């Protein structure tokens, strides 16, 4: 029996990739999503992120630009997209996430406007 937690990460920026690597190293099955097929192709081919020198992404971290693939059947879903994209991404992913027990929004920083 496989007790591995399946985690989908929406966002393939530095925060999404760092979380993917950390969660994978802790024994979880991780899939990372980006809306950019070119970015997914590059991440899959190089297993590195240009803004994270020296960090190698394990071969068993999965990449996709398909929202259904990243969200369907996951135990946990993390939104690691920029704040400006959260609403659009959530609306696009909505058909695939109604039964996921845990959904989180992760952020590196908050910006405030006056």
Question: Which role fits each region the language model picked out?
Answer:
Residues 1-56, 61-65, 91-92:
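NAD(P)+-binding Rossmann beta1-loop-alpha1 motif at the extreme N-terminus of oxidoreductases
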Residues 68:
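Acidic phosphotransfer microenvironment of two-component signaling modules
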Residues 71-72, 76-114:
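Rossmann-like NAD(P)(H) cofactor-binding subdomain of soluble oxidoreductases
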């Amino acid at each position: 029996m496989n007790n591995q937690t399946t985690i989908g990460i929406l966002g393939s920026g530095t925060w999404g990739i760092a979380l993917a690597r950390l969660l994978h190293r802790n024994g979880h099955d991780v899939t990372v999503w980006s809306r950019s097929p070119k970015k997914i192709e590059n991440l899959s081919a190089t297993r590195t992120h240009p803004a994270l020198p020296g960090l190698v992404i394990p071969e068993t971290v999965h990449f996709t630009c398909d929202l259904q693939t990243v969200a369907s059947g996951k135990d946990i879903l993390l939104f690691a997209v920029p704040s400006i994209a959260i609403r659009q991404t959530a609306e696009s992913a909505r058909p695939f996430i109604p039964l996921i027990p845990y959904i989180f929004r992760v952020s590196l920083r908050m910006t405030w406007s006056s």
